UniProtKB/Swiss-Prot annotation:
Belongs to the RTX prokaryotic toxin (TC 1.C.11) family. The Gly-rich region is probably involved in binding calcium, which is required for target cell-binding or cytolytic activity. The three transmembrane domains are involved in pore formation by the cytotoxin. It is found in: Secreted; Host cell membrane. GO terms for molecular function: calcium ion binding; channel activity; lipid binding; toxin activity. This is Hemolysin, chromosomal. It holds the Pfam family RTX. A lipid is attached at residues 563, 689 (N6-myristoyl lysine). GO terms for biological process: hemolysis in another organism; protein secretion by the type I secretion system. Gene3D superfamilies: Serralysin-like metalloprotease, C-terminal (2.150.10.10). SUPFAM superfamilies: beta-Roll (SSF51120).
Length: 1023
């Protein structure tokens, strides 16, 4: 019940009187005189409210002083009686259970009974958490109760004055104002008793069905009855409806009044039937009051009846009023269906929540339906009143009665909801007492069991995917909205959890029921942030399957934050580091990519959680997340990956390292970088007017707000590093470095040492520096710079530029790969293979070897010097090529589809081949050209063949087979040996790598599919 001030009471009384005056304004003089006289008769009984205190009353919880002080503030007269309480109740109230009575002094409130009622509400309020319309708080105070009674009395008694007018006009009977007032007092006593009943055990659903049946068989009311029967099936909905059964009796008032065509006997019979057969004795006081008014009013006016019946049938139930309630039932059914699986896994919380929504939904539906019917009846009477003067006072009376009932309904609704919530809370408490475990934690256990069932195929295959013997999988079950909702409903927000983390073990495609026997220590401690795999005898994968919340303890406190508002606040006593002890003797994999390392603490401030990982002597792999880490890799060949999640803009620096494998890694998180962040969120749950906000930890994969964060990793004894998907920077040490750029346009410098640098995807720049380096461009348009030393450069796909530096002793391999590449050799002996595409090859001043295959595009060889340069046409027969001079260049054409076209440059252009004849001191010629079978063309043999053609006035071109100097399969062996020596020297390959690289550049003996013979090739000379 809301707190009502004296001013509001005065305003309500004034409004009721003004309404009556307005109705009277259009009436005749005799009507006005009658109303005035009736008002005078009832003034003493109706407008005087007295708090009666017997001499033997001392006061209980709400002290006598509180009652007296409150009555004074509200203008309620306080009287002390010399008689004791027993004598007064017999004289005035007839029973000790009545709260309000009527004497010649006025309307009296019996102080002992009021105090008893207050105590009952206060106990109920404490039991229910203080949330039912200020039960145990404001309603527990005398002021609110007294003021509410005063408001009800004022409204009802004002209507009684209008009832007297009807009596005088229609029947001339002699019904005194005191009789009407007594009937009103009986109504209020009954409604107060009904609203105060928290333990009524009658089944509301059964009564509702009976009521619909009775109304369906009652003349003029069958339409409304049918609609009531069409309510959702509420049978067996639960004991939560027990608190509503008494309230339903109030509906009888509206229906008895609404049947204006029924005679007095019918109305009386309907009242008795509704009261005794359907509602029992609960509505007796209300029915007595209504029957008394029926006798006084004589509602048989035909003009009013037609409009009234039509209005009631049309307006009785509005579907819009029940949409939200229907959704509530629908959701409850879905939750109940969802709960079936988890019941089997040992958790009944979802079913409990579904029951709560069904029970409170039934309460909501019933009360909403009652209120809707009451409102529609009142509206119907108001409509009828426009055609009849008699209808006007009837409308005012019904408005007063329905207003009183609606007030009781509203004041009782919250208590009903809380009653249901308390039952659910009792179930939870009993379960925890029996099992010695947190109920909501048990809910997460069930969720995790279902997760394991649903994802078994994936989880059981991780050991194969990562090539290990055992998988140790850590899973975080995050905040569950249904579990959180149940905690809020039952006022258990301080007992719930943000989730729970679990550890599971898999071997040979099977989940182990318990941890392996060799684990003597605690493997996983999420409170302290410790993970210990040091006992493991197997190669192991440590993987965080779902984002893991930061380590630490959650502390919760539930407090009241408003009139009906409660909040459960969360404090995290966090640990700022994860400490991981790795497998000692077996190579293992540590996947930290789902580890949350940033926790938002408000105002764009973040708490960082580092990873400290102590690995063993095996060949380990580490996948890092977006936060800082210290990796002590130990012995073995260890690899650290930054490309499995967004780890920011990466700079790897080994320039200051004093030991091999030591790097400082700086990462900038900001801009477009998204990282896993732990955040605190709130779930809000409503139980009627009570709202419960529960804070919990969750995570977001999002941008860092407002600023850039810089993270620093310290890596020790790490042999290989894989970058991010962004533009990374790598600066190598003076030792051997192995860097992978991964995706993005990377800048990689090996510096000193024999380095291996991989650009991977993106337009990368790789610089080997000093040392025998291997550089791999990968996809993209890359630039590879070999630096001093013997280098191996492979451009990969894309339009790449490869260049090497070094003196005459250097030996380098330059392989362009697919794309239009540019290859620049050194002063030493270089092996240049442009690959597919239209490439430029410049060998430099050393004795270089060029390589060309039939599937390549148009290559340009621009050789600047060297006295023993060679070209290997590895899969081409000289019978499939022709040579022709074009200015100072020599053009080699190759056959395509058995057609050799002189007008299409599809082979090789030898730049400045003939410049030496013009006095050029440089040697731009290739001293030996080999075909696949070891036959050789030299500059001299080619010159003679061209001169022969010219001197005999023949074509300006010459077939390769006609320009041979000598030929033998054995000529290939020295060439192969030279290629092998360059490969062996370049890039510091180990034995296996040498063989692999050599096989890529091996000469083919039978690669051509052409039919050889002068007439098998069609030669065209078109432009």
């Amino acid at each position: 019940m809301p707190t009502i001030t004296a001013a509001q009471i005065k305003s309500t009384l004034q409004s009721a009187k003004q309404s009556a005056a307005n109705k009277l304004h259009s009436a005749g003089q005799s009507t006005k005189d009658a109303l005035k006289k009736a008002a005078e008769q009832t003034r003493n009984a109706g407008n005087r409210l007295i708090l009666l205190i017997p001499k033997d009353y001392k006061g209980q919880g709400s002290s006598l002083n509180d009652l007296v002080r409150t009555a004074d503030e509200l203008g309620i007269e306080v009287q002390y009686d010399e008689k004791n309480g027993t004598a007064i109740t017999k004289q005035v109230f007839g029973t000790a259970e009545k709260l309000i009575g009527l004497t010649e002094r006025g309307v009296t409130i019996f102080a002992p009974q009021l105090d008893k009622l207050l105590q009952k509400y206060q106990k109920a309020g404490n039991k229910l958490g203080g949330s039912a319309e200020n039960i145990g708080d404001n309603l527990g105070k005398a002021g609110s109760v007294l003021s509410t009674f005063q408001n009800f009395l004022g409204t009802a008694l004002s209507s009684m004055k209008i009832d007297e007018l009807i009596k005088k006009q229609k029947s001339g009977g002699n019904v005194s104002s005191s009789e009407l007032a007594k009937a009103s007092i009986e109504l209020i006593n009954q409604l107060v008793d009904t609203a105060a009943s928290l333990n009524n055990v009658n089944s509301f659903s059964q009564q509702l069905n009976k009521l619909g049946s009775v109304l369906s068989n009652t003349k003029h009311l069958n339409g409304v009855g049918n609609k009531l029967q069409n309510l959702p099936n509420l049978d067996n909905i639960g004991a939560g409806l027990d608190t509503v059964s008494g309230i339903l009796s109030a509906i009888s008032a509206s229906f008895i009044l609404s049947n204006a065509d029924a005679d007095t006997g019918t109305k009386a019979a309907a009242g008795v039937e509704l009261t005794t057969k359907v509602l029992g004795n609960v509505g007796k006081g209300i029915s007595q009051y209504i029957i008394a008014q029926r006798a006084a009013q004589g509602l048989s006016t035909s003009a009013a009846a037609a409009g009234l019946i039509a209005s009631v049938v049309t307006l009785a139930i509005s579907p819009l009023s029940f949409l939200s309630i229907a959704d509530k039932f629908k959701r409850a059914n879905k939750i109940e269906e969802y709960s079936q699986r988890f019941k089997k896994l040992g958790y009944d919380g979802d079913s409990l929540l579904a029951a709560f929504h069904k029970e409170t939904g039934a309460i909501d539906a019933s009360l909403t339906r009652i209120s809707t019917v009451l409102a529609s009846v009142s509206s119907g009477i108001s409509a009828a009143a426009t055609t009849s003067l008699v209808g006007a006072p009837v409308s005012a009376l019904v408005g007063a009665v329905t207003g009183i009932i609606s007030g009781i309904l509203e004041a009782s609704k919250q208590a009903m909801f809380e009653h249901v919530a308390s039952k659910m809370a009792d179930v939870i408490a009993e379960w925890e007492k029996k099992h010695g475990k947190n109920y909501f934690e048990n809910g997460y256990d069930a969720r995790h069991a279902a997760f394991l069932e649903d994802n078994f195929k994936i989880l059981s295959q991780y050991n194969k995917e990562y090539s290990v013997e055992r998988s140790v999988l850590i899973t975080q079950q995050h905040w569950d909205t249904l579990i959180g909702e149940l905690a809020g409903v039952t006022r258990n927000g301080d007992k719930t959890l943000s989730g729970k983390s679990y550890i599971d073990y898999y071997e040979e495609g099977k989940r182990l029921e318990k941890k392996p026997d060799e684990f003597q220590k605690q493997v996983f401690d999420p409170l302290k942030g410790n993970i210990d795999l040091s006992d493991s005898k197997s190669s192991t994968l440590l993987k965080f399957v779902t984002p893991l919340l930061t380590p630490g303890e959650e502390i919760r406190e539930r407090r009241q934050s408003g009139k009906y508002e409660y909040i459960t606040e969360l404090l995290v006593k966090g640990v700022d580091k994860w400490t991981v002890k790795g497998v000692q003797d077996k190579g293992s994999v540590y996947d930290y990519s789902n580890l949350i390392q940033h926790a938002s603490v408000g105002n764009n401030q973040y708490r960082e959680i580092r990873i400290e990982s102590h690995l063993g002597d095996g060949d380990d792999k580490v996948f890092l997340s977006a936060g800082s880490a210290n990796i002590y890799a130990g012995k073995g060949h260890d690899v650290v990956y930054y490309d499995k999640t967004d780890t920011g803009y990466l700079t790897i620096d080994g320039t200051k390292a004093t030991e091999a494998g030591n790097y400082t890694v700086t990462r900038v998180l900001g801009g477009d970088v998204k990282v896993l962040q732990e955040v605190v969120k709130e779930q809000e749950v409503s139980v009627g007017k009570r709202t419960e906000k529960t804070q919990y930890r969750s995570y977001e994969f999002t941008h860092i707000n407002g600023k850039n964060l810089t993270e620093t990793d310290n890596l020790y004894s790490v042999e290989e590093l894989i970058g991010t998907t962004r533009a990374d920077k790598f600066f190598g040490s003076k030792f051997a470095d192995i860097f992978h750029g991964a995706d993005g346009d990377d800048h990689i410098e090996g510096n000193d040492g024999n380095d291996r640098l991989y650009g991977d995807k993106g337009n990368d720049t790789l610089s080997g520096g000093n040392g025998d380096d291997q550089l791999y461009g990968g996809d993209g348009n890359d630039k590879l710079i070999g630096g001093a030393g013997n280098n191996y450069l492979n451009g990969g796909d894309g339009d790449d530029e490869l260049q090497v530096q070094g003196n005459s002793l250097a030996k380098n391999v330059l392989s362009g790969g697919k794309g239009n590449d540019k290859l620049y050799g050194s002063e030493g002996a270089d092996l240049l293979d442009g690959g597919e595409g239209n490439d430029l090859l410049k060998g430099g001043y050393g004795n270089d070897i060029y390589r060309y295959l039939s599937g390549y595009g148009h290559h340009i060889i621009d050789d600047d010097g060297g006295k023993d340069d060679k070209l290997s046409l590895a899969d081409i027969d000289f019978r499939d090529v022709a040579f022709r001079r074009e200015g100072n260049d020599l053009i080699m054409y190759k056959a395509e589809g058995n057609v050799l076209s002189i007008g299409h440059k599809n082979g090789i252009t030898f730049k400045n081949w003939f410049e030496k004849e013009s006095g050029d001191i440089s040697n731009h010629q290739i001293e030996q050209i080999f075909d696949k079978d070891g036959r050789v063309i030299t500059p001299d043999s080619l010159k003679k063949a061209l001169e022969y053609q010219q001197s005999n006035n023949k074509a300006s071109y010459v077939y390769g087979n006609d320009a041979l100097a000598y030929g033998s399969q054995g000529n290939l062996n020295p060439l192969i040996n030279e290629i092998s020596k360059i490969i062996s020297a370049a890039g510091n390959f180990d034995v296996k790598e040498e063989r692999a690289a050599a096989s890529l550049l091996q000469l083919s003996g039978n690669a051509s599919d052409f039919s050889y013979g002068r007439n098998s090739i069609t030669l065209t000379a078109s432009a």
